[in-house]
């Protein structure tokens, strides 16, 4: 009896200790700073929302179009010259003995990564581009390999496209690469339409960013200054330090007009019944275009659920809105990709008797997204008629590229038409 009592006491003590240290059974959360670096985050799939990326039951993908940001680069010129290099130069010239400061002692022996040339795709970036090509081949095993892949003419987009081609093709010289000139008078007929848009400014939002940066870095600066008061820490130092670990604009009224060209061209490509067309369309661009396409599609809209369409209220300058939908690190890492799939859902329960079994859905980094006002298909996909109406409605809102951009040059166009060009591009071949 005494032994039973002792066992009970021991068991209760163990239970009490376990309760005080209780952890959720299925918690997988861990903070990874590389997933919070906005446009310089390495490619990852946040699975947001947490939905199955495979086609809905009874549906098969018949065609697909991808818009892909180039793979990881060493650094762009602006970031390197504004933040990265000034911080490392400051470190070289300081007399502070970092080895005697416990919290910052690593700086005594820290050597920054060698960036031989800015703007160039890294070795890991080339590998990730090839992996995306392999992933596509497994994801769409029944679709024909594309005849052509498109890329803007910058070296980093071309190299990224070549990497994907090498991962996607099964034999050498099957897929050609078509380069689309990054012109300043191309109108919407380009993979860099923002360069042909006089109203576009890459520095838009800088004032707001600087306002928030001062608040965000204030406690960090206070802590670092207490560690090393003679170093003259600045806001730019904090940004530079965080950028060395691993590049955001909101509320631009012309975004929808910049992104509509690709959305409209893609709808026409995927809905075409021409047997000579491709099954897979892949286009490489820079980080500026994918966010504008998401705006055109109405995705990750912070103000959508409020009905107020007050963008500024959803992105305050004095705190983090942790409930926001627009999270740059999730939607704009290197190699970020937006896919629009055309599906045949004749075998999907509840949809077998539809006159048109064709449905469309959008994926962002493999995560399925629901289009606002068009979710009448399996797993909230969009019917063919609904998608056509959706794109037409967006055209009424965003279809006037020349007007929205204030174009002053001749021969501008509101249409992205290079996909129908007879240019077959050039062979990429294997890298030996």
Residue ranges and their predicted role:
Residues 19-145, 152-281, 285-432:
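Signature for phosphate-centric chemistry
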Residues 1-22, 432:
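Fungal secretory targeting signals
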């Amino acid at each position: 009896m005494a032994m039973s009592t002792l066992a009970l006491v021991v068991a209760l003590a163990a239970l009490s200790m376990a309760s005080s240290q209780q952890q959720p059974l299925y918690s997988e959360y861990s903070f990874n700073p590389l997933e919070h670096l906005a446009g310089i985050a390495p490619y990852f799939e946040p699975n947001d929302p947490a939905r199955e990326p495979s086609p809905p039951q009874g549906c098969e993908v018949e065609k697909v179009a991808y818009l892909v940001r180039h793979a990881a680069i060493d650094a762009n010129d602006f970031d390197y010259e504004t933040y990265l290099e000034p911080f490392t130069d400051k470190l070289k010239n300081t007399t502070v003995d970092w080895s005697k400061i416990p919290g910052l002692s690593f700086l005594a022996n820290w050597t920054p990564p060698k960036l031989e040339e800015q703007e160039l795709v890294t070795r890991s970036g080339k590998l990730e581009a090839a992996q995306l090509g392999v992933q596509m081949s497994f994801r769409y095993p029944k679709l024909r390999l594309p005849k052509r892949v498109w890329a803007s003419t910058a070296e980093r987009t071309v190299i990224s496209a070549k990497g994907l081609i090498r991962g996607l093709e099964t034999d050498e010289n099957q897929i050609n690469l078509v380069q689309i000139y990054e012109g300043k008078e191309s109108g919407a007929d380009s993979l860099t339409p923002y360069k042909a848009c006089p109203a576009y400014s890459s520095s838009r939002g800088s004032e707001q960013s600087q306002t928030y940066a001062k608040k965000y870095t204030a406690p960090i600066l206070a802590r670092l200054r207490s560690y090393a008061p003679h170093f003259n820490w600045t806001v730019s130092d904090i940004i530079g330090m965080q950028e060395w670990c691993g590049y955001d604009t909101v509320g631009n009224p012309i975004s929808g007009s910049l992104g509509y060209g690709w959305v409209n061209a893609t709808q026409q490509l995927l809905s075409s019944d021409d047997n000579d067309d491709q099954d897979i369309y892949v286009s490489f661009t820079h980080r500026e275009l994918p966010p504008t396409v998401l705006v055109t599609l109405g995705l990750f809209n912070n103000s959508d659920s409020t009905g107020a369409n007050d963008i500024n209220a959803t992105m305050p300058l004095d705190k983090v809105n942790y409930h926001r939908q627009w999270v740059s690190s999730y939607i704009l890492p290197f190699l970020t990709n937006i896919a629009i799939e055309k599906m045949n859902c004749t075998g999907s329960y509840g949809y077998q008797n539809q006159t048109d079994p064709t449905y469309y859905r959008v994926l962002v980094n493999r995560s399925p997204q629901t289009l606002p006002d068009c979710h009448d298909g399996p797993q909230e996909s969009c019917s063919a008629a609904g998608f056509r109406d959706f794109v037409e409605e967006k055209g009424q809102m965003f279809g006037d590229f020349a007007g929205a951009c204030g174009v002053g040059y001749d021969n501008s166009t509101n249409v992205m038409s290079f996909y129908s060009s007879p240019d077959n591009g050039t062979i990429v071949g294997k890298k030996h």
